[in-house]
């Protein structure tokens, strides 16, 4: 467990405008920010000022220890929301897109097959572990500059998605053409395949299959 919180990364964020002329490239700047987020242990992921929830705030017939862990998780989510918000604010005044996605979720004593388990494991695939947030932000200046891309992003709201298409989506969004580019795996493409079956496979071979379905009505 780290003694540092994710906010320690904020002073190191750069926009392309902050780069010296010697380091600027015509294609702009691509950055990856890897957060600890709400990884266990949850109580170590946020400062005391974000300890808003306690065991007494958690309903149900769980044990005091279980309620305390859930409260710590909720606090870590609250803090993570603040950090992600600060990242977005940092880039809101530049020509930027921010994409936030989690690599996995957590189960907190709510998996009927493992009612005493909290966390994520390679051999269990409850819905709360495999369903993750996927957020896209585009700054106002970039929306004005590339309105077509912004319209494509808006059209993608609510589409069924799986994180394995993120690399293809990023490459296409950045205007990079490769022999491996597949528009049906580009979330923002008009040719995106919303009917693709999405399968998650655990380390022991267990599967969680999300059946294909049409894009939601708007």
What is the predicted role of each segment?
Residues 1-218:
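Catalytic domains that recognize anionic headgroups
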